[in-house]
């Protein structure tokens, strides 16, 4: 039986209303209790338990490989670590595309088993009916358009979106808004297109490599703190945590081998 989430968590969906904050919205991905506990004190507007966990946590080759239970286990830990944060959970590939009924069942299962605030799913006009069905069931939905990692094979690889398909992406943004989403992620979309969409739709736009003019910004925390193998162009590294961890481990190993650990104050009385 899963542990019930904290009843003290506050819903902050109003933060996503255009102009309600008077500033940019700021969010990061998060995948575990300990990191969530730290991020809960960083004045972020939201945390996303993204399907990017497929690679950075589970080591799969693409985001489409992660399954629902794997995401739910992570999300439940994040909610326990940051019970007062607005936490969004990605619906994994294959858990919502088939039908409105499946999409609603998956979204409700995620919310019930994790205590999260909302779900996110990929796709614009082609997934508008799924968004609408989930919203009607009472679950807030964040959309995701532009580059959609779950369908990378159909997109032909990692490519900037909007250079030759701007009209389609614009229509996707409108469809997501009309379906009832409270916000939409625009990933790897040209800055000009992201600016146009942001100025013309009424829901908040969250940029991931989409330039300066979106209503908010989102990054994968592993990229931000230097815990990723690959360096992402649109994600500057503010630290090199991989080097810090390696240095700590090597120093401790050295102390063990040289008889300097444990010291007296490391031994329980």
UniProtKB/Swiss-Prot annotation:
Top-level division of the source organism's lineage: Bacteria
Pfam (any one): Pantoate_transf
Residues involved in 3-methyl-2-oxobutanoate binding: 51-52, 90, 120
Primary localization class, coarse: cytoplasm
Keyword Metal-binding applies: yes
InterPro entries, A to Z: Pantoate_hydroxy_MeTrfase, Pyrv/PenolPyrv_kinase-like_dom, Pyrv_kinase-like_dom_sf
Active site (catalytic residues): 187
Pathway(s) the chain acts in: Cofactor biosynthesis; (R)-pantothenate biosynthesis; (R)-pantoate from 3-methyl-2-oxobutanoate: step 1/2
Keyword Magnesium: yes
GO biological process assignments: pantothenate biosynthetic process
GO terms under cellular component: cytoplasm
GO molecular function ontology, one term from the record: magnesium ion binding
Binding site for Mg(2+): 51, 90, 122
Locations listed in the record: Cytoplasm
Cofactor: Mg(2+)
Keywords: Cytoplasm, Magnesium, Metal-binding, Pantothenate biosynthesis, Transferase
EC number: 2.1.2.11
NCBIfam families: panB (TIGR00222), PRK00311.1 (NF001452)
HAMAP family named among the record's database cross-references: PanB (MF_00156)
Subunit text: Homodecamer; pentamer of dimers.
Protein's recorded name: 3-methyl-2-oxobutanoate hydroxymethyltransferase
Species per Swiss-Prot/TrEMBL record: Tropheryma whipplei (strain TW08/27) (Whipple's bacillus)
Name of the gene encoding the protein in the UniProt record: panB
């Amino acid at each position: 039986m899963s542990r019930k989430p904290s009843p003290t968590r506050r819903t902050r969906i109003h933060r996503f209303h255009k102009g309600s904050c008077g500033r940019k919205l700021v969010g990061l991905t998060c995948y575990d209790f300990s990191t969530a506990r730290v991020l809960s004190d960083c004045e972020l507007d939201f945390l996303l338990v993204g399907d990017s966990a497929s690679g950075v946590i589970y080591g799969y080759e693409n985001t489409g490989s992660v399954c629902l239970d794997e995401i739910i286990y992570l999300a439940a830990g994040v909610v326990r670590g940051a019970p007062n944060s607005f936490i969004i959970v990605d619906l994994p590939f294959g858990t919502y595309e088939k039908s409105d009924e499946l999409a609603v069942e998956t979204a409700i299962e995620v919310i019930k088993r994790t205590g999260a605030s909302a779900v996110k799913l990929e796709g614009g006009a082609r997934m508008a009916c799924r968004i609408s069905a989930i919203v009607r069931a009472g679950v807030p939905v964040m959309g995701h358009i532009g580059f959609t990692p779950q369908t990378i094979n159909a997109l032909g690889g990692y490519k900037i979106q909007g250079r030759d398909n701007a009209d389609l992406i614009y229509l996707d943004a409108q469809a997501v808004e009309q379906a009832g989403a409270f916000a939409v992620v625009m990933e790897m979309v040209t800055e000009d297109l992201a600016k146009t969409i942001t100025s013309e739709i009424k829901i908040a736009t969250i940029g991931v490599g989409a330039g300066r003019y979106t209503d908010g910004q989102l990054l994968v925390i592993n990229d931000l703190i230097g815990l990723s193998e690959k360096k992402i162009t649109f994600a500057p590294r503010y630290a090199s945590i991989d080097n810090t961890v390696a240095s700590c481990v090597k120093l401790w190993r050295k102390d063990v081998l040289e008889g300097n650990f444990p010291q007296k104050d490391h031994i329980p009385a």
